[in-house]
Amino acid sequence: MTCKNTRRLYQIITTFLRYGIDEIIPDIPLTRHARLGRKALFWVRNQHKDQPFGVRLRLALQELGPVWIKLGQMLSTRRDLFEPELAEQLALLQDSVEPFDGKSARQIIEQALGGSLETWFDEFDEQALASASIAQVHTAKFNQNQPLVGKDVVIKVIRPDIEPIIKADIALMYRLASWVPRLSNDARRLRATEVVREYEKTLLDELDLTREMANAIRLRNNFENSEMLYVPEMYPDFCHKNVIVMERIYGILVSDVETLKANGTDMKLLAERGVQVFFTQVFRDSFFHADMHAGNIFVNPNHPENPQYIGIDCGIVGTLNQNDKRYLAESFVAFFNRDYRRVALMHVESGWTPADTDIDAFEQAFREVCEPIFAKPLSEISFGHVLLNLFNVAREFNMEVQPQLVLLQKTLLYIEGLGRQVYPQLDLWQTAKPFLQNWLNEQVGVKAILRDLKQRAPQFREHFAEFPEAVFNALQQQKQINFRLDELNKTLQAQGRQKSHNVRSIVSGVIILGVLWRFDDLPLWLSCGTLVTVLLVLLLQRKS
């Protein structure tokens, strides 16, 4: 470890000690090195004893700087790991820092674009429109040299020298996380190293603005011509790893309820559309904006009777596969049907909990945690908290962490919070129910079978020529085996007809298994067709 890193580690540890964060260490025997380390810092005492632990942790992270602030923000969404009071304190962390010099921003942009800003833009504002720990944004207009002359744009630029700072602090986070499992069994359950790894990926992805560009383009295409959501246009010719240029939007922050009402916005429809946008992303597109907090969501001021969301900052997104979506849909439907056994089976069938899990105990654990939720009317039940309760129970049964579902649960909490802030009477279940039912019907109904046949048609055609040969070979093998069986039967006649029949059945079963094994790489319908043919032949021969 370098001297610089050692100094930073010392600063981190003493900051935590000054805020009394070491109280989370239980009264257990510490290692010799840990005891010596704490004694060496005997003079660093908790200077904020009058504050609750959650407040002290928030203040400590705030003091340590942007990388730790963003870690706290991420941890605030992991309500499967922390008490609600602690998560709520961490959610108060604000990723807002002083902007860096506008002239430096100009130099970075010009270096990325390969020329003077005046080549492409007019009215570049060196005063940042907004500033955060990773990047800041400036406004400008396309000049007469561009096809979109006069178009208002926003230029986002990564902070200079932020990457080495992030990587250095991440390395120290890994070192601290490696100590956590040694504290207690509860500390081991936090899987601190896994949390840091997840955070590292999220943070490093945010440093590459071309990812944000690609995500925004994909989301924009998914909602092209949609009345529900508008995503600003990206200008790929001007986008690089540390600089992107996008359309500037003008809207009302979704959290500014008074302005929305003053503008005549249909608040009920706006709240319902927020839920519809989320479930459309999840079940139709398998791709969702995973950072939908109030600062990233605006409402188009035009046509307030038909409100449209505007989404920005696509740096963090989530993707789902069919198994994820099936888990989500079936778990919600089973929960609202109070079918806790189905909920338990879903976790095992998905492979996220061990196959030898005690289903009865699993079901009972879900029942004990989820049943009290129904003391509320259905319209007041939070999907995000339902999912959180499912995660908490599943973790007790050794469920593997599913980062994509953690992202989804965080986003769902954002959507619910914004929806009920806009329209407190929002009925989430009635709004979401059609999406869940339609998706399940499409996956298991006649439509799903027809769609699967259509998708597999080229594969069917490719293997169809093999079908007659497969049947012929199976019949030839059966003919040869029958001859041998006849010889064997003569020998076994003295031992009774029943034994002969048993031998024929056993050998026929071996033939069937052999045929299935030989064609295990064929489509299901072709393998089944071959099997049915062989069974018919065997049946006819038995009758003869």
Swiss-Prot record:
The active site is at D291 (proton acceptor). Its main location: membrane. ATP binds at L129, A130, S131, A132, S133, I134, A135, Q136, V137, K156. Its EC number is 2.7.-.-. It is a single-pass membrane protein. Belongs to the ABC1 family. UbiB subfamily. This is Probable protein kinase UbiB. It comes from Actinobacillus pleuropneumoniae serotype 7 (strain AP76).
